[in-house]
Curated annotation (Swiss-Prot):
Protein name: Lectin 6
UniProt induction comment: Accumulates in roots during colonization by arbuscular mycorrhizal (AM) fungi (e.g. Glomus intraradices).
Signal is among the record's keywords: yes
Glycosylated sites: N116, N139, N271
Statement: the UniProt record of this protein carries the keyword Signal: yes
UniProt entry keywords in alphabetical sequence: Glycoprotein, Lectin, Signal
GO terms for MF: carbohydrate binding
Amino acid sequence: MTLSSALIKIFITFLFLQNHVNSQYSSPSKPQPSLGSTISFSITKFDDESPNIFVKGDTSISNGVLSLTKTDKYSGKPLQKSVGHATHLTPIHIWDETSGELADFSTSFSFIVNTNGSSLHGDGFTFFLGPLHFDLPKNSSGGYLGLFNPETALIASQNPIVAIEFDSFTNGWDPASPSQYTHIGIDVGSIDSVSTADWPLNVLPRNALGEARINYNSESKRLSAFVDYPGLGESTGVSFVVDLRSVLPEWVRVGFSAATGELVETHDIINWSFEAAL
């Protein structure tokens, strides 16, 4: 055998082995189903070096707090037209295509929305479930809450998203009732909420700490959200029946979005826990 033919044989063998190794250890295109499993996490204090929280846009982590929208680094005042996202990197198997089973999930978090004492402020934040590769939509500041593109915001079939919105400014698609100028709502593929309730933000003292609990029951298919302000005697709740299989992909990520527009406020998440079982 000549030297050149031996080298060719060695090269071909190397390519074969490399391809075999790659086929064994390459990442799958999507997570593998695991029926009967439970996924949970609990974050008591946010860490800017955490590998599990992915922030986009203007969202940042500082002093243990997840700040969804931006403030001026010198004055600390909130900035106009700020948009941000924060998602947990763990994929959530929200329903199973083979069996048709739906997951139950529950989440709770503490938050502060600071209006700086202004009667006019905006625009709010959301807790959402969306596709694994969901990104910040273009032009999603203001009333679109960092979650919807203005062109498709009212077309439910275009948005595989379910969210609980904490809306602090009334837009044209929001409830007309003065009692719901600030409100919480359930969004199913659209910024036009399918169910809303009063959120007493404007009667709260500055920097009031809110506690939110969101649950989904796979049997009743009821999505429920409750907000309480301990020690202040203010609470609210909203619910809606929705089959998540008709809206969401099989695998989702969970997280928060927020936005300011011409009007401003701050949106801070203090802690967060989540659990899902399929």
